[in-house]
């Protein structure tokens, strides 16, 4: 059996070029994702500041995801992704300069997180909509799964490389991790110049000048209201995005405080922080590989449900855990469950929505997940600061569990889709 038989998206030269370049870039991104919150916690010692950075990074999604979804449908998606990737590269190099020069302050991190979030709010929608233009609809589920695979493989490699850099470079490891992220963007940007989109709708730019954003957004909302399955997926995504998904932002506080040992040094805490991110990445990678290899499975709703309930239950268990090895296992399962449910949500939406509405509907889904996240980040950060990190995990996990039970009992269409 050829690789392209199991992974049909790899039969596309254009997708493969983009896929490889993005993998290198995502590895750098996860080096920054591991380093930035740890640096912020080292500067302030505040769980609330971790939530504030999450708020700053995700607020642009609340503001831009919906109009961005309309605009993306009228723009060249490949060129849009290139522009946003360049902005993200500049952000990484600015962070590197500030950290290496010793000028870094917490307000720099918050402001640059907002800049990164602004680019991400548009780039994610454009990139997801570009996938079908690279591979066509038959190979789309596999392309989505392969995208998630490299994202989560990068979640493993990024923290591992970060740990090595922080151990080897005594005083400026964070700055060099940011610099490596900036360099990594060159690979995906360069690759995109060699990529073509053979399945693209060439009429996307014809009506850009006459685009009526409120009217077109309303068309997307009408479709969602008339499709109960898509509506429920978006509602669940929003609830989890507020009470559950922001918790991993507290990993530096877990590494430093919840798992504190009498023999701790800065290097030990740094290594523990990287290990927790690594564990989450391994769990996420396992989920992505499974879904990639078996993207043809019909019962996608079942895996979504298992991932949702596992995520909420594990979050509750995290609240009662002080053992380092067991915490590593739980964080790994947290990564697996989070990726499983989000990949299935993404796939169900991409397959169920017509081409003409995909950008708008996906932007609503993205808004549901990340648009509410700024306030979820503040809530979880405030709760962790006021009551404790374990208490924040307990409240978030319990509320997610209660909502999932209610939704699955109240709306039988979910059970019908799962079976």
Describe the predicted segments one by one.
Residues 38-43, 96-101, 157-180, 257-261, ...:
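Transmembrane alpha-helix termini and helix-breaking/packing motifs in multi-pass membrane transporters
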Residues 44, 76, 98-99, 103, ...:
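Helix-breaking motifs and short loop linkers at transmembrane-helix boundaries and internal kinks
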Residues 36, 122-135, 340-353:
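Intracellular juxtamembrane helix-capping segments at the cytosolic ends
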Residues 112-153:
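Cytoplasmic helix-loop-helix junction between adjacent transmembrane helices
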Residues 2-62, 222-280:
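Helix-loop boundary and gating motifs at the non-cytosolic
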Residues 51-53, 63-67, 74, 80, ...:
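C-terminal transmembrane bundle of multi-pass solute transporters/carriers
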Residues 30, 117-125, 241, 245, ...:
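Small-residue-rich segments within alpha-helical transmembrane domains of MFS-like 12-TM solute carriers
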Residues 129, 133, 178-209, 408-419:
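Helix-loop junctions on the cytosolic side of multi-pass membrane transporters
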